[in-house]
Regions:
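FIC/Doc superfamily catalytic core
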Residues: 1-300
Length: 300
């Protein structure tokens, strides 16, 4: 996983001052007894949760208890956050943008603490787990938007939303997210990130979140393109035929897709698709799940 860039970027979005180089030094020689400043405490917590997700994501289900547990771990070393870690907020809060000069700007107000937040989170988690018709990436973008709108915890909501994004991408088969930094892409487009949130929030309670979804998907598309460029530079991509590249791209965008669906999308014979899939399996670029008619494919 692109750990250093992800940890550094996600925390800087929220006002942390540590550079990637400083983050790298801290993670290389981390001593929890010496995490005396807020920035290093937040970096250490984010790193541990990101590492936990990478190692155990199949066992982390989207439940309120797991979300609270992730928040508890995120705030593990933050001295100022011990009083509220792992619990929904006790006081009203707002989505704020942080700037390099230390100033902050309110983007929008969020759900009131207490029942309004608890009920909203129960409904949001229930919707995500029961919704089966919406494409996983659209569903994820919608979940993150609503999570940020509720802002269920006293602090750390932005960082946690990006950790949950990584978790749900992995759980939905988008394993390539481990090799790029979603957080770094958002940091580079921070103004656009807040503008999309603000524009949609201005329409509450009947907002159209198309702008937010387009932004979210655009970030994913950009980092996927960056990954393909890395593959090209490493020589792996240049060893693939045009059809192999097309099929690999389809599998990246549609984890758990079946060979028949690929054949239909590319309008090429099913036997040809199966032969190419066998080559990609042999090269270790994809993996196969299921058996018989239930066989599907994801990138490794």
């Amino acid at each position: 996983m692109a750990t250093v860039r992800s940890v550094g970027a996600s925390n800087r979005i929220e006002g942390n001052k540590m550079s990637d180089e400083e983050v790298n030094v801290l993670l290389q020689k981390m001593d929890v007894t010496k995490l005396t400043d807020r920035d290093s405490q937040e970096v250490a917590g984010y790193f541990e949760v990101l590492d936990l997700i990478a190692e155990t994501y199949p066992n982390i289900h989207l439940t309120e208890n797991h979300i609270k547990s992730l928040h508890n771990s995120l705030m593990k070393y933050s001295a100022k956050d011990q009083w509220h870690k792992g619990n929904y907020k006790l006081h009203s809060n707002a989505v704020e943008a942080s700037f390099p000069d230390g100033s902050r700007q309110i983007i929008f107000q969020t759900n009131e603490a207490g029942f309004a937040t608890e009920d909203a989170m129960t409904q949001l988690v229930s919707w995500y787990n029961s919704e089966k018709e919406v494409h996983p990436l659209i569903k994820l973008a919608s979940f993150v938007y609503d999570f940020l709108s509720v802002h269920p915890f006293q602090d750390g909501n932005g960082r946690l939303s990006r950790l949950i994004s990584t978790l749900l991408l992995l759980k939905n088969g988008y394993k390539w997210i481990e090799y790029v930094s979603f957080e770094h892409e958002i940091e580079n487009r921070k103004n656009e990130y807040y503008q999309a949130l603000r524009s949609c929030q201005a329409q509450r309670p009947n907002e159209d979140i198309t702008l937010w979804i387009q932004f979210f998907l655009s970030c994913l598309s950009n980092i996927q393109s960056q990954l393909m460029l890395k593959l090209d530079r490493s020589g792996l991509e240049t060893q693939l035929s045009p059809k192999e590249k097309s099929i690999l791209t389809i599998i990246q965008n549609r984890p758990h897709i079946q060979s028949g669906e690929i054949a239909a999308k590319l309008a090429i014979p099913a036997p040809t698709v199966k032969r190419i899939l066998a080559h990609l399996l042999h090269k270790g670029l994809i993996e196969k799940q299921g058996s018989g008619r239930n066989v599907s494919y994801t990138v490794r």
